[in-house]
Amino acid sequence: LDIAKAFAANVINGGSGNLIICGSVGTGKTLLASAICEAVIAKKTCRMIRVIDLVRKIKETWSRGSDISEQQIIDQFASVDLLVLDEVGIQFGTDTEKLFLFDVIDLRYQRNLPTVLISNLAVEDIANAVGSRVVDRLRENGGKYIAMKWDSKRK
């Protein structure tokens, strides 16, 4: 909890850095990330989205009648003060999906904007889902990791 509070305070104060939250189903990962967003959103912009929904939004731009480009969607998510990507690892893990995530996270990395990744996967398995370049960027400059190692609260 202290790591999450410090992370939120850092974002509010204009700091960078990233956070990876991992744990089994029902351990409160999304709730914790939502609390971080609630703390941040009073002073900064924050966007929370499941990775699969982000991928869908980008793919929707491929339709003939789309009024928005792939790059515009990527820029929307790359420019908010804090981006929370939930359910990392439930997507198919295709090269295209990994490229989309890399594009968003790399732009955020270049802009020194913080990102939170939430996953049921162990931290060492996240690279398989999103690519090692993404994980490398998230860990740089003191990226934090929270392991929620307790039983589901939904039972």
Regions found by a protein language model. Name each.
Residues 1-19:
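Pre-Walker A (pre-P-loop) alpha-helix and adjacent loop at the N terminus of AAA/AAA+ ATPase modules
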Residues 2, 41-79:
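Short glycine-rich substrate-engagement loop in P-loop NTPases that contacts/grips substrate
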Residues 31-43:
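P-loop NTPase Walker A phosphate-binding motif
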